[in-house]
Amino acid sequence: MEHPEMDMYAYERFLADGKTPFCGVDEAGRGPLAGPVCAAAVLLPEGLVIPGLNDSKKLTAKKRDALYDIICESAVAFGIAFATVEEIEALNIKGATYLTMNRAIADMEPAPVFALVDGNDKNELDIPAIKVVKGDSLCASIAAASVLAKVTRDRYMDDMDALYPQYGFARHKGYGTAAHYAALREYGPSPIHRPTYLRKMH
């Protein structure tokens, strides 16, 4: 009987030729009021099936952490990168997202020839890309990248919680919860808040 997870590997099976490396790419942190955007790129070995792999947003934190270790140990190559709050402000979130995706890809060895990317917007990667709508749920390489990006960014925001405990970053990871907005009204923004994201508060 075929593993149910194998459905996520259709792109990998179709594209695999044993000689052309390709990666899945995804990001975490486009929407939060605070913190960087993080991207990851992952090249999985041909034939690998990772039980339980799915879009990081559909997984518990405990499951993401377990998958993070499996992906890092199993991947042929992976890259993880950030774009800072300052870069988000200077480039807008779309530009900053592609910046960090390109940084993640550039960190990989062997270098991928093309990428599988979630979404359907214009490709602004430095390599050719195949766009996959809902790719983080449908494509194993993209799902693996989504896990690495999400876990890495969440851990960063946990560290920021120790520096700025009044905002509760460990709980909401910078997203606009009621408690986060209440803390902003009481304490004002921290150095890691995104000014353009806070304009609607005024």
Predicted regions and their residues:
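RNase H-like, Mg2+-dependent phosphodiesterase core
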Residues: M1-H202
